[in-house]
UniProtKB/Swiss-Prot annotation:
Protein name listed in UniProt: Biotin synthase
Recorded superkingdom: Bacteria
Cofactor note: Binds 1 [4Fe-4S] cluster. The cluster is coordinated with 3 cysteines and an exchangeable S-adenosyl-L-methionine. Binds 1 [2Fe-2S] cluster. The cluster is coordinated with 3 cysteines and 1 arginine.
Known role: Catalyzes the conversion of dethiobiotin (DTB) to biotin by the insertion of a sulfur atom into dethiobiotin via a radical-based mechanism.
Matches recorded under InterPro entries: Aldolase_TIM, BATS_dom, Biotin_synth/BioAB, Biotin_synthase, Elp3/MiaA/NifB-like_rSAM, rSAM
Subunit structure: Homodimer.
Spans through the membrane: none
Swiss-Prot/TrEMBL keywords: 2Fe-2S, 4Fe-4S, Biotin biosynthesis, Iron, Iron-sulfur, Metal-binding, S-adenosyl-L-methionine, Transferase
Swiss-Prot/TrEMBL cofactor(s): [4Fe-4S] cluster; [2Fe-2S] cluster
Length: 350
Protein backbone atom coordinates (compact mmCIF):
# COMPACT_ATOMS: atom_id res chain seq x y z
CA UNK A 1 0.00 0.00 0.00
CA UNK A 2 1.36 3.40 -0.99
CA UNK A 3 2.60 5.67 1.82
CA UNK A 4 3.06 8.63 -0.51
CA UNK A 5 1.10 11.75 0.43
CA UNK A 6 1.50 15.18 -1.16
CA UNK A 7 0.23 17.54 1.50
CA UNK A 8 0.57 21.21 2.38
CA UNK A 9 -1.09 21.16 5.79
CA UNK A 10 1.42 19.39 8.01
CA UNK A 11 1.15 20.11 11.74
CA UNK A 12 4.26 20.45 13.88
CA UNK A 13 3.27 17.56 16.14
CA UNK A 14 2.86 15.25 13.12
CA UNK A 15 6.37 16.06 11.95
CA UNK A 16 7.84 15.69 15.42
CA UNK A 17 6.19 12.27 15.61
CA UNK A 18 8.00 11.27 12.41
CA UNK A 19 11.32 12.41 13.88
CA UNK A 20 10.57 10.31 16.98
CA UNK A 21 9.99 7.06 15.10
CA UNK A 22 12.45 4.21 15.67
CA UNK A 23 15.20 4.65 13.10
CA UNK A 24 14.38 1.45 11.22
CA UNK A 25 10.72 2.43 10.91
CA UNK A 26 11.58 5.94 9.76
CA UNK A 27 14.07 4.72 7.16
CA UNK A 28 11.66 2.08 5.87
CA UNK A 29 8.90 4.66 5.44
CA UNK A 30 11.18 7.21 3.76
CA UNK A 31 12.84 4.69 1.47
CA UNK A 32 9.51 3.16 0.43
CA UNK A 33 8.23 6.59 -0.59
CA UNK A 34 11.52 7.35 -2.34
CA UNK A 35 11.24 4.21 -4.49
CA UNK A 36 7.68 5.08 -5.51
CA UNK A 37 8.82 8.32 -7.14
CA UNK A 38 12.49 7.98 -8.06
CA UNK A 39 15.03 5.45 -9.20
CA UNK A 40 16.76 4.88 -5.83
CA UNK A 41 20.13 4.33 -7.50
CA UNK A 42 20.18 7.56 -9.51
CA UNK A 43 21.56 10.81 -8.10
CA UNK A 44 21.27 14.25 -9.67
CA UNK A 45 24.61 16.08 -9.74
CA UNK A 46 25.08 19.84 -9.58
CA UNK A 47 28.20 21.99 -9.54
CA UNK A 48 28.25 25.23 -7.53
CA UNK A 49 30.50 28.19 -8.36
CA UNK A 50 30.94 31.39 -6.38
CA UNK A 51 30.66 34.11 -9.02
CA UNK A 52 31.13 36.88 -6.43
CA UNK A 53 32.80 36.10 -3.11
CA UNK A 54 32.81 37.82 0.27
CA UNK A 55 31.89 41.28 1.64
CA UNK A 56 28.24 40.37 2.14
CA UNK A 57 26.47 42.95 4.36
CA UNK A 58 24.27 40.33 6.06
CA UNK A 59 25.01 38.94 9.53
CA UNK A 60 24.25 35.21 9.07
CA UNK A 61 26.18 33.73 12.00
CA UNK A 62 27.25 30.63 10.07
CA UNK A 63 28.63 32.38 7.00
CA UNK A 64 32.31 33.12 6.30
CA UNK A 65 31.27 35.52 3.51
CA UNK A 66 29.76 38.06 5.90
CA UNK A 67 31.73 41.31 6.01
CA UNK A 68 30.99 41.45 9.74
CA UNK A 69 33.28 38.54 10.66
CA UNK A 70 37.03 38.11 10.38
CA UNK A 71 37.34 34.73 8.68
CA UNK A 72 40.36 35.44 6.49
CA UNK A 73 38.25 35.24 3.34
CA UNK A 74 39.32 37.68 0.65
CA UNK A 75 36.53 39.36 -1.23
CA UNK A 76 36.37 38.88 -4.99
CA UNK A 77 34.62 40.83 -7.69
CA UNK A 78 32.02 39.37 -10.02
CA UNK A 79 33.72 36.85 -12.29
CA UNK A 80 34.30 37.41 -15.98
CA UNK A 81 32.05 35.51 -18.36
CA UNK A 82 34.73 33.26 -19.82
CA UNK A 83 35.85 32.20 -16.34
CA UNK A 84 32.30 31.15 -15.52
CA UNK A 85 31.90 29.32 -18.83
CA UNK A 86 35.19 27.49 -18.39
CA UNK A 87 34.00 26.24 -15.00
CA UNK A 88 30.63 25.27 -16.49
CA UNK A 89 32.29 23.27 -19.27
CA UNK A 90 34.44 21.53 -16.66
CA UNK A 91 31.35 20.71 -14.60
CA UNK A 92 29.56 19.24 -17.59
CA UNK A 93 32.59 17.16 -18.52
CA UNK A 94 32.67 15.79 -14.96
CA UNK A 95 29.05 14.66 -15.14
CA UNK A 96 27.10 17.58 -13.64
CA UNK A 97 23.71 18.23 -15.20
CA UNK A 98 23.08 21.53 -13.40
CA UNK A 99 25.37 24.52 -12.91
CA UNK A 100 24.66 26.74 -9.92
CA UNK A 101 26.05 30.26 -9.57
CA UNK A 102 26.15 32.03 -6.22
CA UNK A 103 26.93 35.63 -5.28
CA UNK A 104 27.47 37.01 -1.78
CA UNK A 105 24.89 39.77 -1.95
CA UNK A 106 21.89 40.92 0.06
CA UNK A 107 20.23 41.26 -3.33
CA UNK A 108 21.49 41.80 -6.88
CA UNK A 109 22.02 45.36 -8.09
CA UNK A 110 20.07 46.49 -11.11
CA UNK A 111 23.28 47.41 -12.96
CA UNK A 112 24.35 43.75 -12.80
CA UNK A 113 21.08 42.24 -14.02
CA UNK A 114 21.88 42.36 -17.78
CA UNK A 115 25.19 40.60 -17.15
CA UNK A 116 23.58 37.96 -14.94
CA UNK A 117 20.96 37.28 -17.60
CA UNK A 118 23.69 36.88 -20.20
CA UNK A 119 25.49 34.48 -17.88
CA UNK A 120 22.37 32.33 -17.64
CA UNK A 121 21.96 32.27 -21.41
CA UNK A 122 25.60 31.38 -22.05
CA UNK A 123 25.58 28.49 -19.56
CA UNK A 124 22.29 27.17 -20.91
CA UNK A 125 23.81 27.19 -24.39
CA UNK A 126 26.22 24.53 -23.11
CA UNK A 127 23.26 22.21 -22.56
CA UNK A 128 23.11 22.49 -18.76
CA UNK A 129 20.35 23.38 -16.35
CA UNK A 130 21.02 26.65 -14.55
CA UNK A 131 20.53 27.79 -10.98
CA UNK A 132 21.43 31.01 -9.19
CA UNK A 133 21.51 32.17 -5.59
CA UNK A 134 21.95 35.93 -5.37
CA UNK A 135 20.05 36.90 -2.22
CA UNK A 136 16.60 38.43 -2.12
CA UNK A 137 14.77 39.05 -5.40
CA UNK A 138 12.09 41.55 -6.24
CA UNK A 139 9.21 40.48 -8.45
CA UNK A 140 10.75 42.30 -11.43
CA UNK A 141 14.18 40.73 -10.87
CA UNK A 142 12.66 37.26 -10.68
CA UNK A 143 10.80 37.87 -13.92
CA UNK A 144 13.99 39.14 -15.58
CA UNK A 145 15.96 36.03 -14.64
CA UNK A 146 13.09 33.81 -15.71
CA UNK A 147 12.96 35.56 -19.09
CA UNK A 148 16.66 34.77 -19.54
CA UNK A 149 15.85 31.09 -19.05
CA UNK A 150 17.07 30.53 -15.49
CA UNK A 151 15.75 27.14 -14.42
CA UNK A 152 16.16 27.22 -10.64
CA UNK A 153 16.60 29.88 -7.99
CA UNK A 154 17.96 28.98 -4.55
CA UNK A 155 16.90 30.86 -1.44
CA UNK A 156 17.05 28.89 1.80
CA UNK A 157 14.84 29.41 4.84
CA UNK A 158 17.79 28.30 6.99
CA UNK A 159 15.84 27.19 10.09
CA UNK A 160 12.49 27.42 11.85
CA UNK A 161 10.75 30.79 12.27
CA UNK A 162 11.22 30.48 16.04
CA UNK A 163 15.01 30.01 15.91
CA UNK A 164 15.63 32.31 12.97
CA UNK A 165 16.40 35.40 15.08
CA UNK A 166 19.29 33.54 16.70
CA UNK A 167 20.86 33.02 13.27
CA UNK A 168 20.33 36.27 11.37
CA UNK A 169 18.90 39.73 12.08
CA UNK A 170 19.48 41.65 8.85
CA UNK A 171 16.58 40.15 6.93
CA UNK A 172 13.31 38.72 8.14
CA UNK A 173 11.82 35.30 7.66
CA UNK A 174 9.06 36.95 5.66
CA UNK A 175 11.69 38.48 3.35
CA UNK A 176 12.78 34.95 2.51
CA UNK A 177 9.24 33.74 1.96
CA UNK A 178 8.52 36.75 -0.26
CA UNK A 179 11.51 35.90 -2.45
CA UNK A 180 10.27 32.33 -2.81
CA UNK A 181 6.85 33.67 -3.79
CA UNK A 182 8.42 35.92 -6.44
CA UNK A 183 10.51 33.06 -7.81
CA UNK A 184 7.56 30.69 -8.04
CA UNK A 185 5.32 33.35 -9.63
CA UNK A 186 7.95 33.97 -12.32
CA UNK A 187 7.78 30.36 -13.47
CA UNK A 188 11.23 29.39 -12.22
CA UNK A 189 11.71 26.29 -10.11
CA UNK A 190 12.35 26.77 -6.41
CA UNK A 191 15.38 25.43 -4.56
CA UNK A 192 15.00 25.98 -0.83
CA UNK A 193 16.13 24.15 2.27
CA UNK A 194 18.12 24.91 5.37
CA UNK A 195 21.02 24.23 7.69
CA UNK A 196 21.04 21.90 10.68
CA UNK A 197 23.56 21.76 13.50
CA UNK A 198 23.33 25.49 14.30
CA UNK A 199 22.41 24.90 17.93
CA UNK A 200 18.72 24.50 17.14
CA UNK A 201 16.41 22.06 18.91
CA UNK A 202 14.76 19.06 17.28
CA UNK A 203 11.51 21.01 17.12
CA UNK A 204 13.29 23.64 15.02
CA UNK A 205 14.33 21.04 12.48
CA UNK A 206 10.70 19.96 12.37
CA UNK A 207 9.69 23.61 12.03
CA UNK A 208 12.00 24.19 9.08
CA UNK A 209 10.59 21.20 7.22
CA UNK A 210 7.05 22.26 8.13
CA UNK A 211 7.59 25.66 6.51
CA UNK A 212 8.98 24.08 3.35
CA UNK A 213 6.33 21.36 3.11
CA UNK A 214 3.46 23.78 3.68
CA UNK A 215 4.44 26.16 0.89
CA UNK A 216 1.69 26.33 -1.78
CA UNK A 217 3.97 24.19 -3.95
CA UNK A 218 6.82 22.12 -2.56
CA UNK A 219 10.32 23.25 -3.54
CA UNK A 220 11.58 21.36 -6.56
CA UNK A 221 14.90 20.91 -4.79
CA UNK A 222 15.46 20.82 -1.01
CA UNK A 223 19.12 21.19 0.04
CA UNK A 224 19.82 19.99 3.58
CA UNK A 225 23.12 21.39 4.85
CA UNK A 226 25.10 20.28 7.88
CA UNK A 227 26.72 23.31 9.50
CA UNK A 228 30.36 23.71 8.51
CA UNK A 229 31.95 25.56 11.40
CA UNK A 230 34.28 28.31 10.20
CA UNK A 231 36.77 30.07 12.46
CA UNK A 232 35.80 33.69 12.96
CA UNK A 233 32.06 33.15 12.68
CA UNK A 234 29.82 33.24 15.78
CA UNK A 235 28.94 29.57 15.28
CA UNK A 236 32.51 28.27 15.10
CA UNK A 237 32.43 26.56 18.50
CA UNK A 238 28.97 25.01 18.50
CA UNK A 239 28.66 21.37 19.48
CA UNK A 240 28.42 18.90 16.61
CA UNK A 241 24.99 17.57 15.70
CA UNK A 242 24.49 13.83 16.18
CA UNK A 243 24.94 12.44 12.63
CA UNK A 244 21.86 10.25 13.07
CA UNK A 245 19.78 13.39 13.59
CA UNK A 246 20.98 14.54 10.19
CA UNK A 247 19.82 11.24 8.68
CA UNK A 248 16.46 11.69 10.37
CA UNK A 249 16.16 15.17 8.84
CA UNK A 250 16.81 13.77 5.36
CA UNK A 251 14.26 10.99 5.89
CA UNK A 252 11.53 13.29 7.17
CA UNK A 253 12.15 15.72 4.30
CA UNK A 254 11.64 12.82 1.88
CA UNK A 255 8.36 11.83 3.55
CA UNK A 256 6.96 15.37 3.67
CA UNK A 257 8.05 16.36 0.14
CA UNK A 258 7.99 13.11 -1.84
CA UNK A 259 8.23 14.70 -5.28
CA UNK A 260 11.15 17.01 -4.44
CA UNK A 261 14.81 16.35 -4.98
CA UNK A 262 16.42 16.18 -1.53
CA UNK A 263 20.01 17.36 -1.81
CA UNK A 264 22.80 16.20 0.46
CA UNK A 265 24.54 19.55 0.52
CA UNK A 266 27.22 21.32 2.61
CA UNK A 267 29.03 19.29 5.23
CA UNK A 268 29.66 16.16 3.16
CA UNK A 269 33.40 16.72 3.50
CA UNK A 270 33.06 15.82 7.18
CA UNK A 271 30.68 12.88 6.67
CA UNK A 272 31.79 9.27 6.56
CA UNK A 273 30.91 7.14 3.55
CA UNK A 274 28.62 5.16 5.83
CA UNK A 275 26.71 8.28 6.87
CA UNK A 276 26.31 9.39 3.27
CA UNK A 277 25.09 5.91 2.32
CA UNK A 278 22.42 6.14 5.04
CA UNK A 279 21.37 9.54 3.69
CA UNK A 280 20.98 8.16 0.16
CA UNK A 281 18.89 5.30 1.54
CA UNK A 282 16.80 7.81 3.52
CA UNK A 283 15.89 9.63 0.33
CA UNK A 284 18.68 12.03 -0.61
CA UNK A 285 19.03 11.96 -4.39
CA UNK A 286 21.05 15.02 -5.29
CA UNK A 287 24.54 16.28 -4.41
CA UNK A 288 26.92 19.07 -5.23
CA UNK A 289 29.94 17.63 -7.01
CA UNK A 290 33.41 19.17 -6.90
CA UNK A 291 35.85 20.21 -4.21
CA UNK A 292 34.19 23.45 -3.06
CA UNK A 293 30.72 24.82 -2.35
CA UNK A 294 31.10 28.60 -2.68
CA UNK A 295 33.83 28.86 0.02
CA UNK A 296 33.17 25.57 1.85
CA UNK A 297 35.18 22.36 1.27
CA UNK A 298 33.42 19.47 -0.47
CA UNK A 299 34.63 15.92 -1.20
CA UNK A 300 36.99 15.52 -4.14
CA UNK A 301 35.36 14.33 -7.35
CA UNK A 302 37.39 11.10 -7.28
CA UNK A 303 36.08 10.37 -3.76
CA UNK A 304 32.49 10.79 -4.92
CA UNK A 305 33.16 8.63 -7.96
CA UNK A 306 34.52 5.87 -5.73
CA UNK A 307 31.60 6.10 -3.32
CA UNK A 308 29.08 5.95 -6.17
CA UNK A 309 30.81 2.85 -7.52
CA UNK A 310 30.82 1.11 -4.13
CA UNK A 311 27.13 1.89 -3.55
CA UNK A 312 26.03 1.06 -7.09
CA UNK A 313 24.79 4.61 -7.64
CA UNK A 314 24.91 6.45 -10.94
CA UNK A 315 24.59 10.09 -11.94
CA UNK A 316 21.38 11.27 -13.52
CA UNK A 317 21.40 11.41 -17.34
CA UNK A 318 23.93 8.65 -17.83
CA UNK A 319 27.16 10.57 -17.37
CA UNK A 320 28.82 7.79 -15.35
CA UNK A 321 31.67 7.23 -17.78
CA UNK A 322 32.68 10.87 -17.56
CA UNK A 323 33.06 10.62 -13.81
CA UNK A 324 36.17 8.55 -14.54
CA UNK A 325 37.97 11.56 -15.93
CA UNK A 326 39.79 13.97 -13.71
CA UNK A 327 38.59 17.56 -14.23
CA UNK A 328 41.71 19.31 -15.60
CA UNK A 329 40.17 22.37 -17.22
CA UNK A 330 40.57 25.06 -14.57
CA UNK A 331 41.71 25.57 -11.00
CA UNK A 332 38.76 25.60 -8.64
CA UNK A 333 36.99 28.76 -7.51
CA UNK A 334 39.32 29.24 -4.52
CA UNK A 335 42.41 29.48 -6.74
CA UNK A 336 41.45 32.69 -8.48
CA UNK A 337 44.25 34.51 -10.20
CA UNK A 338 45.18 38.15 -9.80
CA UNK A 339 42.09 40.25 -9.10
CA UNK A 340 43.14 42.77 -11.72
CA UNK A 341 43.09 40.17 -14.50
CA UNK A 342 40.31 39.67 -17.02
CA UNK A 343 38.96 36.93 -14.79
CA UNK A 344 36.64 39.42 -13.10
CA UNK A 345 33.69 41.29 -14.52
CA UNK A 346 33.74 45.08 -14.26
CA UNK A 347 30.18 46.40 -13.98
CA UNK A 348 31.48 49.91 -14.54
CA UNK A 349 32.69 48.93 -17.99
CA UNK A 350 29.15 48.31 -19.27
Amino acid sequence: MSQLQVRHDWKREEIEALFALPMNDLLFKAHSIHREVYDPNEVQISRLLSIKTGACPEDCKYCPQSARYDTGLEKERLLAMETVLTEARSAKAAGASRFCMGAAWRNPKEKDMPYLKQMVQEVKALGMETCMTLGMLSEDQANDLASAGLDYYNHNLDTSPEYYGDVITTRTYQNRLDTLTNVRASGMKVCSGGIVGMGEKATDRAGLLQQLANLPQHPDSVPINMLVKVAGTPFEKLDDLDPLEFVRTIAVARILMPLSRVRLSAGRENMSDELQAMCFFAGANSIFYGCKLLTTPNPEESDDMGLFRRLGLRPEQGAAAKLEEESAVLAKAAAYQDKSSAQFYDAGAL
